[in-house]
Amino acid sequence: MNYAYDVIVIGAGHAGCEAAAAAARLGSTTLLITMDMNKIAQMSCNPAVGGIAKGQIVREIDALGGQMGIVTDRSSIQFRMLNRSKGPAMWSPRSQADRIRFIAEWRNILENTPNLYMWQDSAVSLTIENGVVKGVKTAFGVEFTAKSVVLTAGTFLNGLMHVGPVQIEGGRVSEPASHGITEQLRDLGFTVQRMKTGTPVRLDERTVDFSKATIQEGDADFHHFSFLPTVKSELKQRPCWIVYTNSEVHQILREGLPESPLYNGQIKSIGPRYCPSIETKLVTFPDKEQHQLFLEPEGENTHEMYLNGFSSSMPWKVQFEALSKIPAFANVQAYRPGYAIEYDFFDPTQLHHNLETKLVKNLFFAGQINGTTGYEEAAGQGLVAGINAHQAVAGGESFVLGRDEAYIGVLIDDLVTKGVDEPYRMFTSRAEHRILLRQDDADRRLTPKGYALGLATQERYDLMRSKWDAVEKLVEFAKEFSVKTSLINPEFERAGFPTLAHGCKLYDLILRPQLSIFLLAEMIPELQKRILELEQARREEIVEAAEISIKYNGYIAREEAIAKKLSRLEHVKIRGKFKYSDIHSLSTEARQKLEKIDPETVGQASRIPGISPSDVNILLLLLGR
């Protein structure tokens, strides 16, 4: 038995799995400690991956050489591309996943990753000497040593669940909470706070009247998260269903509010703004006559279904009575109630951009303990933390992504620069350069970085190069190919499009909003021939990327120029150069915020809430710029 490792990862949730896999694949001997090896990468809440902005993060994880996209594709039971009615910067992939298959796929990957080992136990304390982490002690009394440690404890640190007046210690239903680490880190100067999240009731589909629900099928043109074309789901595809609350449901819930832990003072922590409980919806939107709910399958062959939109900590009798007033649930049976959970998290402004803590060297935090919510946000942090835990051991440079390079970069920069006062969820609106951070080109942006690290394989890198070579050739063909009116006008007349007065380049036709490359291929044999010559497994992906490149070329070029201009401030280092409390030309708020955050660069300083443009100019003047 080995007790000495390069990297130890505490917690095998979505952050921990990515961290452990990354560190081990980069060459560090890695130990993953988890309370239950049968619940690795457990989907604690909804059985889905992706969504608005979250789907882009999963694509970025995959492009870098992470695993979440592969696991999701292999366990997918429904796929949808959200926001297709909007521009491509807003397109967001989302997949329903088989919960059990998701765990099995992750465990298979971890158990077959060289350098990676697992230990089932609970970590109770860290070994820290002279401000440097040296190892981990467990509940079984085992001591492991490590050169770096990644803490990804999720909701388990002093977790407390609520169902009405009933309170149960735990990190998840039927799983114990973790004690000891929070108290140790608080004594070392870490700022510890509490947050709250929740999950809805699980229902038995055999007792649902689907004739009173609206079906929601997945996309027929099935996409995938992974850029590897060989990764596919072999599972049966299943639909979701839509139902609505009504006045009877609302009346029962309102009468039960005095028993709600959220409204009687039992829960004092702040919950996620963008995933409110059903009782919060009623209080916040008292005039709304109904709320939409989604009934989502938990897997390919299970009868268990997740009621998205009905998160609650009300007493079970109130939850059930309200549910039964929804026509589709008149005779419903449940598997378990919804519940709320409070847990500890640490102020993320006490982290560097590589997710190493400022107070303890070689100790990294990732996931919900940094104040985020969501599997995808956790996994993205876990990947970065795992990479940097390895880099700390190997003596390599820290791996940091910029705001113009990845949503993961936006996420981490927001956390360490602005901090959080409520659970942080990623949105496309948080990214000022979102047209540069599309889901379709995550491989072009990030696979070269993953390849340089040694995380993305040669196969992945070659696939990325061949794809974008094909995209560029298709764009060049569009620029060079002349379309004659004698060819296209009869086709346009049949389709009801305005005819051309004179010939033009194919590129100019693709620029038209109502015309797609695939539609034009039906009218132009030479274009059809070009498309059919493309690799079949990636044909749609290549054509889609070429079309986006053409239609949005002007916007993309303009945004790249803006990002390049702003990036100059990211290269002006200021950490350690000033004692901010002595710079009286700065505002009082600016001095306080700069002292607390201790930004790495002027660019980061400019994004701290309360730092004005004049404060930034003062810093630049003091630097002689």
Describe each region flagged by the PLM.
Residues 10, 143-154:
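Short hydrophobic core segments
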Residues 430, 436, 447-617, 621-625:
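Extended, charge-enriched "interface" segments that sit outside catalytic cores
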Residues 4, 21-125, 140, 152-169, ...:
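Conserved N-terminal/central alpha/beta ligand/cofactor-binding core
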Residues 2-15:
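Beta1/beta-strand and adjacent pyrophosphate-binding region of the FAD-binding site
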Residues 36-38, 54, 182-320, 408, ...:
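An anion/pyrophosphate-binding glycine-rich loop and adjacent beta-alpha core
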Residues 127-143:
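Conserved beta-strand-loop-beta-strand element in the redox core of flavoprotein oxidoreductases
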Residues 378-399:
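Internal hydrophobic alpha-helix adjacent to the cofactor/substrate pocket in enzyme cavities
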Residues 306-372, 400-413, 539-593, 598:
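A glycine-rich dinucleotide-binding beta-alpha-beta segment and adjacent secondary-structure elements
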